[in-house]
């Protein structure tokens, strides 16, 4: 089944409570934790993640875009998010990070990989991974378009992982390019403006979910 995880950072930060109220019919909420060092932006911190978790029953997936992901393992486990990943580029020992999340009870654990990082950097962790996030825009490029070079990386990962690992694509995905993303081998996408930039975010999410599920069915992966 196709999964859609709208990114809360694309909603109005001045009215985050109102945005959160409008997400209650979603199946996932994506939270970017950016520290201003690994990437230039600063988004949500652990206090905000904890506040969101206390005020919604929607499963939360957290994408750590930080220099020291190990520092976030304990808080994430205490908060009880549903899924968490960090960038392979920021992890000297990715296996240690993944094992720590697993021991802490995080349901889904993963790695993220930047646009220009070779896909080979993640392939050896297949036995520990539940999912991989492929960042499909240039780093620090909020709002820039999807980069098609991501598709070949997803294809290679799907060939290597088979069906064992869920493949997510994050950045610039919309209703137009989603079929290409699914055909390349992705099962899930993170979107921002494609949902929260619309007049009716829930209706937009439902349209994207239908496109994704229809494409998976055509590919024989429903």
Provide a role label for each language-model segment.
Residues 133-183, 187-188, 194:
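Active-site/ligand-binding-proximal alpha/beta "capping" segment
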Residues 96, 103-108, 217:
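Short acidic, glycine/proline-enriched helix-loop-strand junctions
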Residues 1-85, 91-93, 109, 117, ...:
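Conserved N-terminal beta1-alpha1 strand-loop-helix module at the mouth
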Residues 80, 105, 185, 190:
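Conserved functional loop/turn residues at catalytic and ligand-binding sites
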Residues 210-222:
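Generic C-terminal helix-cap and adjacent flexible tail
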Residues 34, 43, 108, 141, ...:
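Short glycine/serine/threonine-biased micro-segments
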Residues 53, 101-102:
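A generic structural signal for well-ordered alpha-helical segments
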């Amino acid at each position: 089944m196709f999964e859609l995880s709208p990114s809360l950072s694309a909603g109005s930060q001045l009215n985050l409570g109102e945005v959160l109220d409008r997400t209650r019919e979603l199946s996932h909420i994506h939270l970017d934790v950016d520290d201003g060092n690994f990437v230039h932006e600063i988004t949500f911190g652990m206090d905000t993640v904890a506040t969101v978790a206390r005020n919604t029953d929607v499963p939360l997936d957290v994408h750590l875009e930080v220099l020291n992901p190990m520092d976030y393992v304990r808080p994430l486990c205490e908060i009880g998010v549903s899924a968490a990943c960090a960038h392979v580029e920021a992890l000297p020992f990715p296996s240690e990070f993944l094992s720590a999340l697993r021991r802490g009870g995080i349901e889904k654990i993963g790695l993220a990989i930047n646009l220009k990082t070779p896909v080979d950097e993640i392939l050896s962790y297949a036995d520990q991974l539940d999912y991989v996030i492929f960042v499909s825009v240039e780093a620090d490029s909020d709002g820039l378009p999807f980069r098609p070079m991501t598709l070949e990386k997803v294809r290679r990962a799907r060939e290597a992982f088979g069906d064992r690992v869920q493949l997510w694509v994050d950045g610039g995905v919309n209703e137009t390019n989603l079929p290409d993303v699914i055909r390349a081998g992705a099962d899930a996408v993170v979107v921002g403006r494609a949902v929260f930039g619309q007049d009716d975010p829930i209706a937009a999410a439902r349209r994207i979910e239908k496109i994704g599920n229809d494409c998976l069915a055509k590919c024989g992966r429903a």
